[in-house]
Amino acid sequence: MHKITRIIVFTIVLLTFKTQAQQSVAREWNEQLLEAIRNDFARPTVHARNLFHTSLAMYDAWAVFDPQAETIFLGKNFGGYSCAFNGIATPSDVESARHEVISYAMFRLLSHRFQNSPGSVETLAAFNNHFTSYGYDDTLTSTDYSSGSYAALGNYLASEIIAFGNQDGAHEESGYNNLYYSPQNPPLVLELYEDNTAIDPSRWQPLAFDVFVDQSGNVYPLNTPDFVSPEWGEVVPFSLTSDELEVLNNGFDSYIYHNPSPPPTIQNSNEDGFDDPYKWYFSLVASWSSHLDPNDATMIDISPNGVGNVNFNDFPQTFEEYRSFYDYMEGGDPGTGHSINPYTNMPYTPQMVKRGDYARVLAEFWADGPDSETPPGHWFTIMNYVSDHPLIEKRFNGQGPILSNLEWDIKCYLTLGGAMHDCAVTTWGVKGYYDYIRPISAIRYMAGKGQSSNAALPNYDPHGLPLVPGRIELIESGDPLAGSGDENVGQIKIFAWKGPDFIADPDTDVAHVDWILGTHWWPYQRPTFVTPPFAGYVSGHSTFSRAGAEVLTLLTGDAYFPGGMGTFEAPQNEFLVFEEGPSESLTLQWATYRDASDQCSLSRIWGGIHPPIDDIRGRIIGEEIGVEAYNLALSYFNGTLSTDEFAQIDDIISIYPIPFENEFTVKHHLNEPLKMELYSIDGKIVKSDTILTNNQKVTITSLQKGIYFVRLSNSQNEIVSIKKVIKQ
């Protein structure tokens, strides 16, 4: 009942918008893909790749008939794979030809990619029904487009992408299997609450289940799921470049882009457990677990007036900055909210809700995204939500003419798909190499060791949890947890969500928060899922979401959702899946795309999935990837640069210093003047200049600190580079 309700809830808003305009063929096939993902195994890497490859197919099917745009795959060498293409006659009806090529390409590619899905019967039938509803012939399988057949061109494009996918490093033909990785820790049998103190507390630990059910509701064929995609760094990316790549070895060669540096390992603390970054990060996850109770009277304002508006410059770098950024006891970040909605010029209306409802809804909404499209697919649903909004103007980067629905969707999907794919390649390369532990293992490990705050108190161990009054304490005689024979006296107790043992019927029961044995701590997740089957560092949710936010900001030319706010309704006692709730209806609200991204990041801490160190470094990587993917996509849309040429020009144009105060220098070696335009994050030009010489300084006064974009164009008004700069 809950799952059906959740799909309907999110779709109501979209359906309201959809009735206002006919959807493009690209949008219709994207919706087919998103539904197929919901019925497949929850594999973020695999589906980020599916989203990118299908977006690439649709883009080339569109671009081949555009006089300006440049194809990426047809007739090109992409990622070491050469796709021959001899051209095709210009159609008298371009719109009809594009529709046909896109439909044949998507039908063939999607049918291939989902043939082994657990929902294949339903999914393949849906693909066929959708394809034939256009009047196309599913028996036409020729790839010989030399006669001018647009159906054959679609088939050919799909067959070439399928062939490319069989050698791009994903190991698709053998079921996306791992070749080299093996876990260093034995599985944790969750329900036995066994001693977990013999593990390596820096390495990922598999989880063992009676039955494992993934995020999409599929029963997994193994009761101890393997690490998903630890070697994914080898997969051919979209915009990632060789100068961002390191090949490191931690038992096997790992391909790592945007290396975030190692996460902290546990220290042999000498009565300073709370000052050990490892202990602080993971114990914060346990502390925030205390917020997951609807009986908690704490009320917070979750409107854009009360949350959001975190500046990129505020992201912590040092341990002390982390301790200032995250509120250990009360939850949340230093975001001050937005005083005014820029579209209405009115203050945002406060929305006071129970923190216990907000944290639970947040954890579940972003976990499934919103119903198991996996995180990269979730950002496609947000993109579609934005595209359907009646206030959106489909001007690329907020400028120029209004685009057709098809051109808008094609360009948005390629940019977003490329970014999501690059996030998967980067994040899972990092995960596979650093192989970092998850909170479920780290917290149970430290709780089993004891406490690390005071050697004069019972159960002291340098690897124990820090004692925090009201959150992490020692069990004393007479405590309800002491046991009938005081067998638990001196053990660690945590004030936290009580876990699935206290939920018999998820439609009526709530586990609530209370003191529990530290070795019995659970993330706020379903007992058949608990934690994703791969290492934590860095957070995929944080990386995907920050990249998605950057892409949407750049595509729309506006940091804000249309109308100044995006929303999601969580009805009373109808939204939560594995326990009853929320106790009152609430609406998730985001002023900007970055606010949504930051909220997603916090949700993974409240959900017990990631500590702060996983989060911030993922956000930073995601921001870099989002801008890179946009820049490369833009070069294809403008048709001015091939991939190699773009890389060469981008390499010989640099801007420094970053961050800057009142001036920066543009360095270039192009033999012509460049037009420089400085854009604010909401797409407004704040300065224009002509760069006549190499090492020319640009002076800027009275500019607020924040993120800006420098766009450089040549004398033909062709964009040659877009670079992000930061005003401090």
Model region roles, listed by residue range:
Residues H2-F10:
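Sec-dependent signal peptide recognition
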Residues K3, L15, V46, S601, ...:
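Short alpha-helical segments used as structural interaction elements across diverse proteins
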Residues I12-T19, W62:
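Residue-level signal for alpha-helical transmembrane segments in multi-pass membrane proteins
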Residues L15-K18, D644-Q728:
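C-terminal outer-membrane/trafficking sorting elements
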Residues Q22-G639:
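Acidic/polar surface patches and capping/hinge elements
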